[in-house]
């Protein structure tokens, strides 16, 4: 534990804005309560909606809760506000805190800020991108975990990994450790506000996403993403995928070194047997390998881990084969480009793919997606929602059936009815 960590938060009046239900807010609250902070927690969700999170905090006394709303008065008289990712850019409550000269922090960036302030020699590897960041994050973590098995060094996961909070890592990290952080654009807002970047930054891809939040302001979206490298120092590294490298700006201004990571079927290292499907995953592997090399990890360890890495749940994950029909789960593909990448990975099955998708819309464009989909599939099943309406409009006339459903049960019923031996049912 960092010695400063024991007393830094003690007695501070801290407002947590956004408890949530995925665990990160709960873990931040527990950590701060252990450090004797005076806590207020506010969330737009109601007590009923937050029941699972509140249950985990019920043994902690003296937390003030303001639920189902925010009160402007709570954003004054505090020593710090810790906001959750996704708080609106124009939040009047954050504006009130800033007006009252209250520091506004975020979990991941505050962790990095404090390790830097306390001159702890912890290497932070940050990964962002529209696609691939979770796979790259977990592959880097797996490589380092294997490499550090018999070492004093430890590796930890942080950032946007589900259920994990970064601040509690202050209890664990020590000199020489590495923290691997998946970072979305919202969390990188915090890095920009703190004017810090990871020691090693990985930028996988850049594609439109979260445009319902950014109100179609791609420059603002990119600006938040660019905080992954914008505040790097001499001696730091930026590792970029080829797609991201085309749009990266300011890359020569901060003294950090940078490299574009590439891999294709033609240049897979000799003797490597890779299990992950798809060209996009070869780029993900290349990014992770470059990071491992920059950290001095032996090639044998890298090769062993890459060959044993099977990917993550929901990322073109093979589920089962029944009656000759293969089922794949790619539900983390929430943009048209990500779904097309999955189809391209299964291109040997062109004309044999039953695609299940659609649903809610994030203010994205679907014209190219609709035309490309036609090249791969034999049937399309779409969950009702704004995205589905746009996809159906963009498709026009088709030679394959298009169905709109309101439940997974109905989607699978239709998919099975349209499938035969040798087909693929893909949820993406």
Regions found by a protein language model. Give the residues of each.
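Generic hydrophobic/aromatic pocket-lining and core-packing "Φ" positions
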Residues: 26-29, 94, 225, 366-370, ...
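Short beta-strands and strand-loop turn motifs
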Residues: 17, 107, 203-205, 425-428
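C-terminal helical cap/extension that packs against the catalytic core
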Residues: 52-64, 70, 367-423
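Short internal beta-strands
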Residues: 37-45, 238-242, 353-357, 376-386
């Amino acid at each position: 534990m960092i010695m400063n960590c024991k007393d830094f938060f003690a007695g501070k009046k801290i407002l947590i804005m956004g408890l949530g239900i995925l665990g990160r807010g709960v873990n931040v609250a527990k950590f701060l309560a252990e450090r004797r902070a005076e806590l207020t927690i506010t969330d737009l969700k109601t007590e009923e909606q937050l029941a699972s999170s509140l249950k985990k905090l019920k043994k902690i006394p003296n937390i003030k809760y303001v639920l189902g709303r925010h009160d402007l008065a709570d954003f004054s008289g505090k020593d710090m506000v810790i906001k959750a990712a996704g708080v609106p850019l124009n939040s009047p409550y954050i504006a009130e805190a800033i007006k009252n000269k209250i520091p506004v922090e975020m979990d991941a960036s505050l962790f990095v800020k404090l390790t830097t302030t306390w001159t702890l020699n912890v290497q932070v590897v940050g990964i962002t991108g529209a696609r691939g960041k979770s796979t790259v994050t977990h592959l880097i973590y797996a490589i380092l975990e294997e490499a550090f098995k018999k070492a004093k060094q430890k590796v930890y996961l942080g950032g946007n990994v589900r259920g994990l909070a970064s601040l509690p890592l202050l209890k664990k990290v020590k000199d020489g450790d590495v923290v691997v952080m998946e970072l979305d654009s919202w969390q990188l807002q915090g890095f920009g506000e703190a004017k810090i970047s990871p020691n090693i930054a990985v930028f996988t891809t850049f594609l439109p996403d979260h445009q319902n939040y950014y109100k179609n302001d791609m420059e603002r979206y990119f600006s938040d993403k660019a905080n992954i490298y914008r505040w790097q120092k001499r001696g730091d590294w930026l590792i970029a995928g080829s797609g991201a490298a085309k749009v990266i700006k300011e890359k020569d201004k901060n003294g950090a070194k940078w490299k574009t990571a590439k891999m294709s079927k033609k240049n897979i290292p000799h003797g490597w047997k890779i299990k992950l499907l798809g060209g996009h995953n070869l780029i993900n592997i290349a990014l992770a390998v470059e990071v491992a090399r920059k950290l001095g990890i032996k090639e044998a360890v890298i090769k062993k881990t890459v060959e044993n890495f099977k990917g993550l749940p929901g990322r073109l994950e093979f589920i089962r084969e029944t009656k000759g029909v293969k089922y794949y789960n790619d539900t983390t593909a929430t943009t048209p480009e990500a779904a097309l990448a999955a189809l391209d990975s299964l291109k040997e099955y062109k004309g044999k793919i039953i695609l299940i998708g659609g649903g809610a819309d994030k203010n994205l464009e679907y014209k190219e997606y609709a035309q490309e989909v036609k090249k791969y599939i034999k049937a399309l099943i779409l969950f009702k929602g704004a995205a589905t309406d746009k996809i159906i409009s963009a498709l026009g006339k088709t030679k394959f059936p298009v169905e709109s459903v309101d439940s997974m049960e109905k989607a699978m019923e239709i998919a099975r009815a349209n499938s035969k031996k040798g087909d693929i049912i893909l949820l993406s």
